[in-house]
Swiss-Prot record:
4-CDP-2-C-methyl-D-erythritol 2-phosphate binds at D8, V9, H10, H34, S35, D56, I57, G58, T132, T133, N134, E135, R142. It comes from Chlorobaculum parvum (strain DSM 263 / NCIMB 8327) (Chlorobium vibrioforme subsp. thiosulfatophilum). GO terms for biological process: isopentenyl diphosphate biosynthetic process, methylerythritol 4-phosphate pathway; terpenoid biosynthetic process. This is 2-C-methyl-D-erythritol 2,4-cyclodiphosphate synthase. A divalent metal cation binds at D8, H10, H42. The gene is ispF. The record marks H34, T133 as: Transition state stabilizer.
């Protein structure tokens, strides 16, 4: 068994949709990035890639490549799952933490868990998504951006 950790940060932008965990969350601002800027799925992708010693999301999906402009991070996560499978690994458990002040995402967490589990052919009960504020501290507290952390456990098939 191997453990991976991932973190991702994106700043808010008024001309973007807020996509988190593959769910479009109603919000006056979205996250800025080369792809759809799904901060949660990016952190998970990094955790999985790291656990398998396959590098990071930037290595596999560089933001300098037009191929990934506005890319759907659900598709990127599916690709990460295939890379793990090619190396003989499967995800066992994923635990995540999303930090943002607004909007509240509690109504969307179950769909996010379903999306993540579906992308990686996992049981939804093995995927955890949690959210908290930053108590108005730092860039998250000032609502300048959002951050996500992910920890995963993978094992050889």
């Amino acid at each position: 068994m191997r453990i991976g950790i991932g973190i991702d940060v994106h700043q808010f932008s008024e001309d973007r949709k807020l996509i988190v965990g593959g769910v479009e969350v109603p919000s006056p601002v979205g996250l800025l990035g080369h792809s759809d800027a799904d901060v949660l799925l990016h952190a998970i992708s990094d955790a999985l890639l790291g656990a398998a010693a396959l590098g990071d999301i930037g290595k596999h999906f560089p933001d300098t490549s037009p191929d990934y402009k506005d890319a759907d991070s659900m598709e990127l996560l599916k690709h990460v799952g295939k890379l793990l499978e090619q190396e003989g690994y499967k995800p066992v458990n994923i635990d995540t933490m999303l930090l943002l002040e607004k909007p509240k995402i509690a109504p969307y967490i179950e769909q996010m868990r379903r999306n993540i589990a579906s992308c990686l052919d996992m049981d939804m009960n093995d995927v955890s998504v949690k959210a908290t504020t930053n108590e108005k501290l730092g860039y998250v507290g000032r609502q300048e951006g959002a951050c996500a952390h992910a920890v995963c456990l993978i094992e050889k098939k």
